[in-house]
Regions:
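Glycine-rich loop(s) and the adjacent beta-strand/alpha-helix scaffold that form part
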Residues: 122, 135-142, 148-210
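Conserved redox-cofactor binding core of oxidoreductases
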Residues: 2-133
Length: 210
């Protein structure tokens, strides 16, 4: 949008740069949907699409006829597998409306159903519970993050974990809070805050909040 409309700062990469990574994630997670060839909605690595119900099919047909095929009503694309993934011990969607409660069949993609089991299967996963990360440790000499400081919520003791790579995956607000709480004399506004934007213009996805 930035390049086409000539506004703001353009991205340094394009969709084609990200496409292989999108494909990798889509195949791993399992995305059902239909390939429509729409420029505004790029196709993905889809599993067979869920079917529209009778009413939806009727509405879709009328929309297509009314707009001479220029507008489409399609099934929503979602991370519900419609074909079993035995390598992940996941079975296809059972249409039980239990997605939001943590699908017991593993059909709806989640950390519990897919990524944690895959990580555990490598033999390189150590899962720590009751640990609250309070700070990312920044090594001034190496000029990189080298670990995290955590508080054990049960013992009320502080521990330090080191790693070659640190991933910050605590959602919008907690990730921002953690980076700000990791401020140093090099990064007084928070770790990585070179633009002054950290802590500002934060966006999050709220679900059913009045």
């Amino acid at each position: 949008a930035n390049a086409k409309e000539g506004i703001a700062v353009d991205w340094p990469i394009r969709y084609d740069d990200l496409a292989p990574w999108y494909s990798y994630v889509e195949k791993f997670a399992g995305i059902q949907g239909s390939k429509e060839g729409l420029e505004v909605l790029p196709d993905s690595e889809f599993l067979p699409a869920m079917d529209l119900n009778v009413v939806e099919k009727e509405v879709a047909a009328k929309i297509k006829t009314h707009y001479n095929g220029k507008r489409h009503m399609i099934i929503g694309r979602s991370a519900n597998i419609t074909q079993a993934k035995p390598e992940q011990n996941r079975v296809s969607c059972q249409y039980r409306n239990r997605c939001w409660r943590g699908c017991p069949f593993g059909a709806y993609f989640s950390t519990q159903s897919a990524t944690l089991p895959a990580a555990n299967a490598t033999g390189n996963l150590t899962l720590e519970t009751d640990k609250i990360v309070t700070k990312i440790i920044f090594d001034k000499d190496k000029k990189k993050a080298t670990g995290v400081e955590v508080i054990d919520a049960v013992e009320n003791k502080t521990y330090t974990y080191t790693a070659k790579i640190i991933f910050v995956c605590a959602s919008s607000f907690n990730s921002t809070w953690l980076l700000m709480n990791s401020a140093t004399d090099i990064w007084p506004g928070g770790l990585g805050s070179s633009s002054g934007e950290l802590g500002n213009n934060v966006m999050d996805h709220h679900f059913r909040i009045g």
